[in-house]
Amino acid sequence: MASFTPEVIGYLGFFPITNTLLDTLFVDTLLVGGTFAVTKNLSLVPQKAQNAVEALLETFYDLTTSVAQNRAAKIFPYFMTFFLFILLANWSGLLPGVGTIGFFYHHGEEKEFTPLLRAATSDINTTLALAIISAIATHILSIQITGIKDYISRYLSLNPLNLFIGILEIISEITKVISLSFRLFGNIFAGEILLVTISGIFAFLFPLPFMLLEVIVGVVQALVFGMLTMAFMAIMTTPHHHKEGVEDPRTK
């Protein structure tokens, strides 16, 4: 049965190396390697593979533009980075050997199995880190685009009503981090438990429909995380005291 917490494979000094950390490094390697492979032989007259990648990126960029409008160019890289990393991290748990190749160790009289790799997003530490990075990037982008004065005015004001709203905004930012992290973790961890249970009871073809379901869940959860981050960034990069019908030059 999958453990709620990641298993420790070894230590680097006093720093524990978990199987989800190894999977994170594996996914990072795939992303970096894939980026080099895709961009290595770009041409003005694109071939089939380049055409497919460009069409996919254009679709996502149009989606970002529909949400963030003239801030799309700044928000799009964050959206795609989160989407691709989370997608590969979700799918990595379905690869042969992930969760099944490892070693046994004795815990008292019992023998327990520790997998060498485990889907990174099935670890609450990973999803919480992603949510915190998303929140920090959102606030940095907000300051860059709207300015520090406008940013502070969202949370601090001499007006008692606006000050109360600002406090609610701060609470809202905390709940965003919690909801982003637990939504992703809960769905992927539940899928991991489901696959382990089904595979333990049945063999061969019966688990395949559930694996297909997890492929779809992996896409949906990556898209949800990326789009929520995109929406939060679009909201935070809109000037707080934006006048209707007047475009703030700082958002260009």
What are these regions (language model features)?
Residues 1-252:
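Selective transmembrane helix interface/packing segments
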